[in-house]
Each structure stands twice: as structure tokens, then as C-alpha cells.
Design a protein with these regions (language model features):
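Metal-dependent phosphoester/phosphodiester hydrolase catalytic core
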Residues: 1-203
Length: 203
């Protein structure tokens, strides 16, 4: 099995609450404990050869299985209201895409769907209510939350760039995002009409 954690491995909505809450001693101790046991039982120690880095700043991993590259994105360790992945994780991700995925298919694991409904109007309304924090984790967890939309586009464009690179091999390859979290099954497609490329998503 290959595993990646999400908020429920820590507590519901981790990373999508105000920073002063996330930084308090109670929350930080919960996070450190969850991180310790995630390393032991899911990552199975930092000796795991698939990790993109061994410095514990994030747990994104990559491996090859038959004609698929499997790239697991860590969307929790560095998450805040303002980012999904930190700069060092982006650097490791870009390096792996540039140096390793030159042909074959790509399966990207993203705990929260990249292709999903736009809740920005609802999010704007909730921001002005007294129960903002109770609903924050459900709305701000999404890639399409207003604070994450730029990073979402960065991920999509980066995947399309990799598709163009793989075209050089003259092989018919696919890029598929495998996701979950939203309690509903779905299929989605992101189209690049200019270059006739597609990214499929399965939830």
C-alpha cells in the first residue's frame, strides 16, 4: 500500500484554521503526536526510499509501478489558510517532474479534489458570520478556496507542462489525479485547448 495523511489523521480541518489557533501549544502537540505516528504506521520511517525529502518538512513521495509514475502530494504538513504546499515542497515536486517523469503515465494523489465545485460565494458569506470557524475547515480545505486558487492553477499548469515534455517520447500517456475527501464519487477533466491536452480526475 501507499499512504498519505490528511486532516483526519491529525484532526478535522488541520491547516485551515486561523494561524494563531494552529500555533497554540495544544494544537502543536496534537500535530507533533499525529506526525510521529503517521511516520511510524503509514510512512514506515524516514528510511522510506520513496520520500522526496528526508528532512521531515513534508512527506510527498514518488514511485514507479509498471508504466505509471505515482506521485503522492502531502497537502497537510505545510498547510495553512494561505498555502497548501510550502516552497521547499514545490521545489522537490518540480525537480521530480523535470528529472524523472519523461515518459509513461502519471498518477497524482491529492487528498482533496483539484476539480470540484466553486464555493467562493458561500465562503465569502461565511467569512462574515459568527460561526465562521465551525465551517472554515469544509470550505477553506478545498483547492478552490479563494486563498488557494493561485496555487491550484500553479499545480495544473505544472502538470500540463509535464504532459508537453512527455509528448517528446511520442507515446500516448495519461495524467490522472486520484482524490477523495468529499464523500461522493465523480469524474472530472481539465482541458488545455491550446495544446490539446487533458488531465483526468477520479474521486
Amino acid at each position: 500500500t501507499v499512504m498519505m495523511w490528511d486532516d483526519h489523521d491529525i484532526f478535522d480541518g488541520w491547516g485551515s484554521y486561523p494561524q494563531e489557533l494552529l500555533d497554540c501549544d495544544v494544537y502543536q502537540n496534537i500535530f507533533k503526536t499525529a506526525k510521529k505516528y503517521f511516520e511510524i504506521f503509514q510512512i514506515r520511517s524516514l528510511k522510506n526510499q520513496t520520500l522526496l525529502t528526508k528532512d521531515r518538512t513534508h512527506f510527498s513521495f514518488a514511485l514507479k509501478f509498471r508504466n505509471y509514475h505515482i506521485l503522492g502530494l502531502d497537502n497537510r504538513t505545510q498547510r495553512s489558510i494561505y498555502q497548501v504546499m510550502g516552497n521547499d515542497q514545490w521545489k522537490d515536486l518540480n525537480t521530480y517532474l523535470d528529472e524523472n517523469i519523461l515518459n509513461d503515465n502519471l498518477l497524482v494523489l491529492s487528498a482533496v479534489p483539484v476539480v470540484y465545485r466553486d464555493f467562493s460565494l458561500t465562503e465569502n458569506l461565511v467569512d462574515f458570520t459568527s460561526w465562521q470557524e465551525e465551517l472554515t475547515d469544509d470550505l477553506k480545505d478545498h483547492w478552490r478556496a479563494k486563498e488557494h486558487q493561485g496555487e491550484r492553477m500553479r499545480l495544473i499548469m505544472r502538470l500540463f507542462m509535464n504532459i508537453e515534455k512527455r509528448k517528446v517520447s511520442k507515446r500516448n500517456t495519461r495524467t490522472v489525479i486520484l482524490s477523495g475527501d468529499v464523500h461522493v464519487g465523480s469524474l472530472g477533466v481539465i482541458n488545455d485547448h491550446k495544446n490539446q491536452n487533458k488531465i483526468h480526475q477520479v474521486v
